[in-house]
Regions:
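Sec-dependent bacterial lipoprotein signal peptides
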Residues: 1-17
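Cysteine-nucleophile amide-bond enzymes
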Residues: 19-195
Length: 195
């Protein structure tokens, strides 16, 4: 019986693994159907969401592809909903900033609306106010690898930081937290589903 070489086993594993792996890179579709989808997602967020909720997305940018690959999760970015202003507050490489809701939704391949477990009893209003105060702060590049730099924020760090005063004694929130983990600390109100 002939012996198989290690190369043959590796080639077989790669071939078979490729059959089960989901695509990591997603491209933004164009056209009228995409515009209808964007409007549907935004409408669901407006009707089901509240100030201080989290929007967790799978985006189309190269960094979204990188985050999805490294975390092996279907989500790559997160933001805080400011429903009163029809905006989100998000942390990206330029820093913490506001983005119109429609523009944020347009960069989403998939969108999940999450109500944080700490959002009750007026906490969401205080959390949103904290997020508004953090606009202009720099991005926390080192936080992505677990090295926290005070007064700098990456996307999911921002979403959790604004609720930090309301964490309960038993709430164990690891650092770093990737966007694909946020639903563990909330209730999913809407999920657009994968395309």
């Amino acid at each position: 019986m002939p012996r198989s070489s290690p190369r043959a086993w590796i080639a077989a594993a790669v071939f078979l693994g490729g059959c089960t792996a989901q695509p990591v890179i997603v491209d933004r579709p164009e056209g009228e159907s995409r515009a209808r989808l964007d409007e549907s997602m935004a409408s669901n967020v407006r009707s089901l969401g509240a100030n201080g909720d989290w929007l967790v997305i799978r985006g189309y940018h190269a960094t979204d592809n990188l985050v999805a690959t490294l975390t092996n999760k279907p989500f790559s970015h997160a933001a805080v909903l400011d429903l009163d202003r029809d905006r989100v507050i998000e942390a990206e490489s330029p820093g913490v900033h506001e983005t119109p809701l429609a523009k944020f939704v347009a960069k989403a391949h998939r969108l999940m609306l999450v109500r944080p477990v700490w959002a009750g009893k007026g906490n969401a209003a205080a959390a949103l106010e904290k997020a508004r105060q953090l606009v202009g702060r720099p991005y926390d590049f080192l936080g992505l690898i677990g090295l926290d730099v005070p007064d700098r924020y990456y996307c999911s760090e921002l979403t959790l930081e604004i609720y930090r005063p309301f964490l309960r004694p038993g709430d164990l929130v690891p650092r770093p937290v990737d966007p694909g983990q946020l639903h563990y600390w909330g209730r999913v109100l809407y999920d657009s589903g994968a395309r």
